[in-house]
Swiss-Prot record:
Keywords, alphabetical: Ribonucleoprotein, Ribosomal protein
Keyword Protein biosynthesis included in the entry's annotation: no
Top-level taxon of the source organism: Bacteria
Family (UniProt): Belongs to the bacterial ribosomal protein bL19 family.
Recorded GO CC terms: cytosolic large ribosomal subunit
UniProt cross-references to Pfam families, sorted A to Z: Ribosomal_L19 (PF01245)
HAMAP family: Ribosomal_bL19
One of the protein's GO biological processes: translation
Protein name (record): Large ribosomal subunit protein bL19
InterPro entries: Ribosomal_bL19 (IPR001857), Ribosomal_bL19_sf (IPR038657), Translation_prot_SH3-like_sf (IPR008991)
Organism of this sequence: Lachnospira eligens (strain ATCC 27750 / DSM 3376 / VPI C15-48 / C15-B4)
Function text: This protein is located at the 30S-50S ribosomal subunit interface and may play a role in the structure and function of the aminoacyl-tRNA binding site.
Molecular function terms, GO-annotated: structural constituent of ribosome
């Protein structure tokens, strides 16, 4: 039974999964369907967490919009996610950056990783 599930999940994985880490600033292009129209909506922010493996892998991105924190979580291998491009590499020392939710202004920034 386990191999059957694994075969089905492997068929649903994206061939080119985007490469990014927690702390990176990313620009996510997602398909939004409104009625009979379909458009691409861009969401740019800091990756707070990545969790799960395989088809169940998800990532959460946070940005501040008009002084209000907005977080969105997407499945990594979803067909809704058109592309994920890394705008800036961040240096994170934690796997989950949940502490950024309480911070505002410059304190909510992640240091840039120089490679």
């Amino acid at each position: 039974m386990n191999t059957i599930i694994k075969n089905i999940e492997d068929a649903q994985l994206k061939a080119q999964a985007p490469e990014f880490r927690v702390g990176d600033t990313v620009r996510v292009s997602a398909k939004i369907k409104e009625g009979n129209r379909e458009r691409i909506q861009v969401f740019e922010g800091t990756v707070l967490k990545k969790q799960g493996t395989g088809v169940r892998a998800t990532f959460t991105v946070r940005k501040i919009s008009n002084g209000v924190g907005v977080e969105k979580t997407w499945p990594l291998h979803s067909p809704i996610v058109e592309k994920v491009e890394v705008v800036r590499r961040g240096k994170a020392r934690r796997a989950k950056l949940n502490y950024l939710r309480q911070r505002t202004g410059k304190a909510a920034k992640v240091k840039e990783l120089v490679r």
